[in-house]
Amino acid sequence: LVRAATLVRITERVLAPAHAAQAWERALQASVFGQEALEISDMRLPSPLTPLLDETHAYASRFLTQGRPWVEALLDLACHIQSEFIYDPEATQVDTTLAEMLAMRRGVCQDFAHLMLSCLRSYKLPARYVSGYLFNAPLPGVPKLVGSDASHAWVESWLPGLGWVGFDPTNGKLADHEFITIGWGRDYSDIAPLRGVVLGGGDHELDVRVTVSRMDETGLAAYASPQTQLDETA
């Protein structure tokens, strides 16, 4: 049994119109020849779980048209993955390949993130796999995001002058203040939320539950108090 509680402070980042209007080709050029090219070069290459397939290159070509704004193109790609693939927790396993998922047209957040990564990397655009959590207690009348009751996965791509910007192909939206980043890597194999070895007979089943709640200033003060910290370590 593994339990963890974490206090996270998140500041929402707003995309300036000048950044959002950049053509995707400019992002590609900067990722190859810019100052950060070496630092992000490994995120332009295929990885064990995100091979470069003809199918993913063809899929991405629908959105990465000549001169199209970078944010618009990538958000459109994420939205179409959300609408054209079915979220089905029973459809895939950790070892399901990207080609198998494409044939089924269904999967989970991990699969959709791998699909978007392969699409972007097939055009040599730098993109990384992000693992984290979603805020799963929205305001009244606002539906929960898909994947908010367990660990979640989405994609970040690099934009010149701004850095890494997140896109969620499971929910078809930009990753905003509701997304809590735990780590990132080339694909799921780099950043699995929990690793370990279980010894014993019989069948084993993994059960994951996540709760994310807003905390006001009073709650923050109580959480940070010496007495609270003492109680947690007792």
Q: Where are the language model's segments positioned?
A:
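Hydrophobic/aromatic-rich core segments of domains that either
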Residues: A58-S61, C79, D111-G202
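Short hairpin/turn module used for nucleic-acid contact or packing/dimerization
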Residues: I191-A234
